[in-house]
Amino acid sequence: MKTRGFSFPRQRQVLFLFLFWGVSLAGSGFGRYSVTEETEKGSFVVNLAKDLGLAEGELAARGTRVVSDDNKQYLLLDSHTGNLLTNEKLDREKLCGPKEPCMLYFQILMDDPFQIYRAELRVRDINDHSPVFRHKEMVLKISENTAEGTAFRLERAQDPDEGHNSIQNYTISSNSFFHIKISGSDEGMIYPELVLDKALDREEQEELSLTLTALDGGSPSRSGTSTIRIVVLDVNDNVPQFAQALYETQAPENSPVGSLIVKVSAGDADSGVNAEVSYSFFDASEDILTTFQINPFSGEIFLRELLDYELVNSYKINIQAMDGGGLSARCTVLIKVLDSNDNPPELIISSLSNSVAENSPGIVLAVFKIKDRDSGENGKTICYVQDNLPFFLKPSVDNFYILMTEGALDRESKAEYNITITVTDLGTPRLKTEHSITLQVSDVNDNAPAFTQTSYTLFVRENNSPALHIGSVSATDRDSGTNAQVTYSLLPPQDPHLPLASLVSINADNGHLFALRSLDYEALQAFDFRVGASDRGSPALSSEALVRVLVLDANDNSPFVLYPLQNGSAPCTELVPRAAEPGYLVTKVVAVDGDSGQNAWLSYQLLKATEPGLFGVWAHNGEVRTARLLSERDAAKHRLVVLVKDNGEPPRSATATLHVLLVDGFSQPYLPLPEAAPAQAQADLLTVYLVVALASVSSLFLLSVLLFVAVRLCRRSRAASVGRCSVPEGPFPGHLVDVSGTGTLFQSYQYEVCLTGGSETGEFKFLKPITPHLPPHRGGKEIEENSTLPNSFGFNY
């Protein structure tokens, strides 16, 4: 705590005046208890639960504690039994000194609701001290002409006990000159006086020695003794006379050591040695002797140690003036100590909580008491906390204050507060005391976990390995401790047909997502599901986020040739007139790929040919065209192998085998021979040759000119429709994917049947060209491309 000068703050303030016995007693109750001093530690005082009318266990449930005014733990409360016990041996003389009765004031504090019960404990005295004289020997100088009945006041004995246990009587040893008289004082103390019964004669006896005994009233009684030595003097006519019987003065408590407090003066009408006056303290207490000193020759009283108004606010000192002849006189000096603002306010914490739960307004954080040992304006105080904090001070009885939360706290906004309680007095100069409290705001589960994204998009390539980590979700919770520990889970899918539990799993601790099985892009391209994040608070709070998984296509499907059919049946043979010009469309290889994207981009390449250089394949559409003019030297039958390759990594491929037959004209019937039976094929071929030869001879003469002209005229007009075989119109096989615009053939690109193979009867059909069903929007482009064939073929040889 700090003590320093003060400038008045413009903040929340609580002004109150410290009175000697405190402030209002309203509504707090008051208990009076007692205990005998010097009882052992743990001695029973009272059962507070019964005395306050509380149920068993209520003291413990309400956090009851006992605090004393001086912040010392003289008492101990057993909150389970309700017994109030002594925490140490109590010495009444140390606690209260000469003050009687000896009271210890304390408070009983309880929470829920907050209450203060005020109480006092009286420490009863026992006779544990004997009377003690400060001087073991007292010297009295008495003139021989002193009249009988003259009383001489003696030094009294000291006994720290009080009441009946204090000094009750004085006695003197047996003698024929003196007896003891007991006198009282305004303070209630008794003094011994030595009364002269018989005139003294110095010539008979110069000195006498007596024993003074002090007796207390305890049972058994205790006593103390001192020796009185009486010196008989010659005649001394005059007694010293003080200028004043009572001297009154004031001394500020901050007066420095050595300061002159007051000067007393006494005169003596005698002359010589009998007129020499000396000054001394008479029957002074130990406190007076340690605080002041007197000059025996001048009568000046000086300060020997610093004054403390809070300990002693006034002193009454008896001064004795004695002349050289042994005669003395006494006066009284009354010193009033003036208070100065030399004590900063004291802040005594009775109850303190260093932690408070957030969202808890009106919670008691601390209970403390303010004391200022000064008086008047110096004892008035102002108490406040910082104005920018959500806390306030509530005054209570007996200068107690309660520090409370003003509103609900939010740990996520601020988890720790440094509160400074400042107490300032109104003295000059102003002094203040500061007490700092560090308050931790404990967490309440008032924040749900929050995902870093409202939705997540994850990519996973098909044919993945099971238990593959495909991604993660993450959520944070602004709370702390277990309230911030997040657990992840999969929420039931909105689509009841989605087998989510067999597709993915989530790690409950870190939000990692795993694919449980291998995914197939061709079966499932994407799926959505929700994940939840919940904390471990009570009650638990949760949130959710959307996760979309996109399956990336892998090149796991080879191209599939739709035309010509590669199913092992008799091949379809393409007929090409020998009069065909370069770029003549022989046929088109049609293939599809079950993959997507570039994995389904197909390219075509002539892998093998009976006569290289005669035919070419367009790389992007699979069209097979003639590469040059045909001649009579070219073989009639050709076998082409076309490679269809996709654009995946690594690429996949398939091959298509084509059979091409070169013919002179389309009026001649032709039936392809099955390769499966070579002998039968030779017979069929011989029959065909005979028929053709017979027809040729019969019609050679009549039709040679007409046929020649007709063939030449029709060759160009019918070139696009000659030699095409059909693929049955209908849907693709179920295991294939219809891909448009990826380089494969449109479904509407069809051929009619031109020939059938595998017939043993030699049946055949003449070629019947039809118009292809092409999409309207590509018609112009197709015509344009075909029109440029003679100039740029783009063949792939």
Swiss-Prot record:
This is Protocadherin beta-9. Potential calcium-dependent cell-adhesion protein. May be involved in the establishment and maintenance of specific neuronal connections in the brain. Residues 777-797 are annotated as: Disordered. Keywords: Calcium, Cell adhesion, Cell membrane, Glycoprotein, Membrane, Repeat, Signal, Transmembrane, Transmembrane helix. Residues 1-26 form the signal peptide. It comes from Homo sapiens (Human). The chain crosses the membrane at residues 691-711. InterPro entries: Cadherin-like_dom, Cadherin-like_sf, Cadherin_C, Cadherin_CS, Cadherin_N, Protocadherin/Cadherin-CA. It is found in: Cell membrane. Glycans are attached at residues 169, 418, 567. Residues 712-797 are cytoplasmic. GO terms for cellular component: membrane; plasma membrane; synapse. GO terms for biological process: calcium-dependent cell-cell adhesion via plasma membrane cell adhesion molecules; cell adhesion; chemical synaptic transmission; homophilic cell adhesion via plasma membrane adhesion molecules; synapse assembly. The keyword Glycoprotein applies. The keyword Nucleus does not apply. It holds the Pfam family Cadherin_2. Residues 35-133, 138-242, 247-347, 352-451, 456-561, 568-671 form the Cadherin domain. GO terms for molecular function: calcium ion binding. Residues 27-690 are extracellular. PROSITE patterns: CADHERIN_1 (PS00232), CADHERIN_2 (PS50268).
